[in-house]
Amino acid sequence: MVSGGRVGGGEGEAGEAAEVAVAMVDNEEEVAQAQAPPAAAVAARELVVGYALTSKKAKSFLQPKLRGLARKKGILFVAIDQKRPLSDQGPFDIVLHKLTGREWQQLLEEYREEHPEVTVLDPPGAIEHLLNRQSMLQEVSELDLSDCHGRVGVPKQLFVNTDPSSIPAAVMRAGLSLPLVAKPLVAKSHELSLAYDPISLTKLEPPLVLQEFVNHGGVLFKVYIVGDAIRVVRRFSLPNVDVGDLSNNAGVFRFPRVSCASANADDADLDPHVAELPPRPLLEILARELRRRLGLRLFNIDMIREHGTRDRFYVIDMNYFPGYGKMPGYEHVFTDFLLSLVQKEYKRRPSYSSCEG
């Protein structure tokens, strides 16, 4: 059980949302220029990005605006044929993937060993950590930061894989308070349930993770991370629950997900205390530490601010390679990120003449 430890002492696809840029290294342009390979070398060939995505993910991510900008910047996206050996395809500069399964993971690990010069986004072993909600938030709970302009923790939660009739007793032993958010153990599923009373708990279907519901004013902050870049958008979320709700509601309320792209809250008329974004320094240090600990460069964090506070935040979920198509201006952020990988680890390859996948 993650006990909801705090951090610091100081302060799962549609629609477009207004951009809120919150993090970029101040001297990013100077650093990029200093690290960049000779312009002639970059122009000599395209940057080839092989992608292995589900058809749904490919459609939402590889939108025309991304493909068009990528072509202008010399980036070519090529579909990977999962039925053929990876070594027989390419050559690739970068492999971008979001597939699960032991067979794919083994193929990719073997490819990484044979082609260490290719950047794989991200290592399969690191991705595994975010696919299981029992362990997903452990790194957040173990962070020990100081002077980060706020406190970050995780709600109390309990892993349940037992007979449903025994769940109320397990919840009581763990010291969790109702209502509880029930989440499937496997993070691929976005369906959530809210249980208001002990009887409701017996209607749940393990294995799952139970998480204390924290009132947060009905607003959630989606923090998108692409390498060193951070973007934040506000989304409408579940409303606050008061004592009256606990008394008058019973049963299990199911939700397809806590937030959705159509529920963008950036332009809504919100209480300023609810709408205020988490402090930039807090997000920067949190993202940096999670990148280091998780070994990932493409993920997002779902954060909430405890209602009635200004500096107490909770991370309630994380996702690998989230729906970047919903992130404002994602095509610019993502193409810049891909080019930065070449600037840091530039290696000359034969030209690639195949058509886009």
Curated annotation (Swiss-Prot):
GO molecular function terms noted in the UniProt entry: ATP binding; inositol-1,3,4-trisphosphate 5-kinase activity; inositol-1,3,4-trisphosphate 6-kinase activity; inositol-3,4,5,6-tetrakisphosphate 1-kinase activity; magnesium ion binding
Protein name listed in UniProt: Inositol-tetrakisphosphate 1-kinase 3
Assembly with partners or alone: Monomer.
InterPro entries assigned: Inositol_tetrakis-P_1-kinase (IPR008656), InsP(3)kin_ATP-grasp (IPR040464), ITPK1_N (IPR041429)
Gene source species: Oryza sativa subsp. indica (Rice)
Residues bound to Mg(2+) 1: D302, D317
Tree of life domain: Eukaryota
Cofactor binding remark: Binds 2 magnesium ions per subunit.
Record field: catalytic activity: 1D-myo-inositol 3,4,5,6-tetrakisphosphate + ATP = 1D-myo-inositol 1,3,4,5,6-pentakisphosphate + ADP + H(+); 1D-myo-inositol 1,3,4-trisphosphate + ATP = 1D-myo-inositol 1,3,4,5-tetrakisphosphate + ADP + H(+); 1D-myo-inositol 1,3,4-trisphosphate + ATP = 1D-myo-inositol 1,3,4,6-tetrakisphosphate + ADP + H(+)
Gene that this sequence comes from: ITPK3
Residues engaged in binding ATP: 133, 183, 211-222, 237, 262
Pfam families: Ins134_P3_kin, Ins134_P3_kin_N
